[in-house]
């Protein structure tokens, strides 16, 4: 069984136009999370915490996955795409060589909650054309196994006799993103490839990880060892909900400057120059 090697408490942060959020991971020593770069959780019942949204801004060199649990968020980009994310919808955006987009709330009150995950691209694909796709929540596969369920956003894994296949296939890294809900007393074992990075973010309730049953409470990211199955147990009296992220590390240099993630300082400088010259997105 995989074991917990590190646990990180999500930290309060602010991004965009004053949007309050939790930075789950990102920044220092990014190789720990390879091929993932950053995970944010945003969520509030107070409109002033999210109403400013994320006005137009650039990206280059990676992909973003936005997963809405509750609320309404509108995407617009330089390619003319417009999409509205509602409860349980998912957006997968490939920045590639460059995209300029905004993410703005389309509500003035009520609950907004969700996640944004950054997934790295290999050097060979960092300058590929930008792409964007919105997926209604009802189109994301959900697999029910008695006392737990798996919403398969990306990747695939076999649980028992069932092939759990996510909506998105990510050939560069075999990236997996699963939203798992565990009823009290349930146990799930995920047979991951030994070479894969594996991360567990408990966003509601509490679980225990591995044979040692290391506690993983709400707003905690657990980074696991790279061998054996990933075992998650809900020993509590309430439902637990968590994101499981797994993927093959790229093992390439990671150089990040704000919204740009490349392999060298020179490439970052070029991205900044391209953006300032108005040619980032071609």
Predicted regions, residues:
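Jelly-roll (double-stranded beta-helix
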Residues: 1-282
């Amino acid at each position: 069984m995989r074991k917990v090697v590190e646990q990180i408490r999500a930290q309060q942060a602010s991004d965009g136009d004053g949007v309050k959020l939790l930075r789950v991971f990102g920044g220092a020593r990014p190789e720990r999370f390879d091929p993932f770069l950053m995970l944010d959780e945003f969520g509030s019942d107070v409109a002033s915490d999210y109403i400013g949204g994320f006005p137009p801004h650039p990206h280059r060199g990676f992909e973003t996955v936005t997963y809405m649990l509750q609320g309404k968020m509108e995407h617009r980009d330089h390619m003319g795409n417009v999409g509205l994310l509602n409860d349980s919808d998912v957006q997968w955006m490939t920045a590639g060589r460059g995209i300029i987009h905004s993410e703005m709330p389309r509500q003035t009150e009520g609950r907004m909650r969700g996640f944004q995950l950054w997934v790295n691209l290999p050097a060979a694909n960092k300058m590929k054309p930008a792409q964007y796709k919105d997926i209604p929540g009802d189109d994301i596969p959900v697999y029910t196994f008695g006392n737990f369920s798996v919403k398969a956003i990306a990747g695939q894994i076999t649980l028992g006799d069932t092939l759990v296949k996510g909506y998105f296939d990510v050939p560069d890294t075999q990236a997996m993103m699963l939203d798992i809900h565990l009823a009290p007393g349930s146990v799930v074992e995920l047979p991951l490839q030994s070479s894969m990075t594996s991360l567990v973010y408990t966003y509601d309730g509490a679980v225990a990880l591995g044979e040692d049953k290391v506690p993983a409470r709400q707003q905690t990211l657990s980074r696991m060892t790279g061998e054996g199955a990933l075992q998650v147990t809900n020993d509590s009296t309430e439902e637990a909900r968590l994101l499981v992220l797994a993927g093959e590390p790229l093992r390439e240099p990671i150089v990040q400057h704000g919204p740009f993630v490349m392999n060298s300082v020179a490439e970052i400088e070029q991205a900044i120059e391209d953006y300032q010259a108005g040619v980032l997105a071609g």
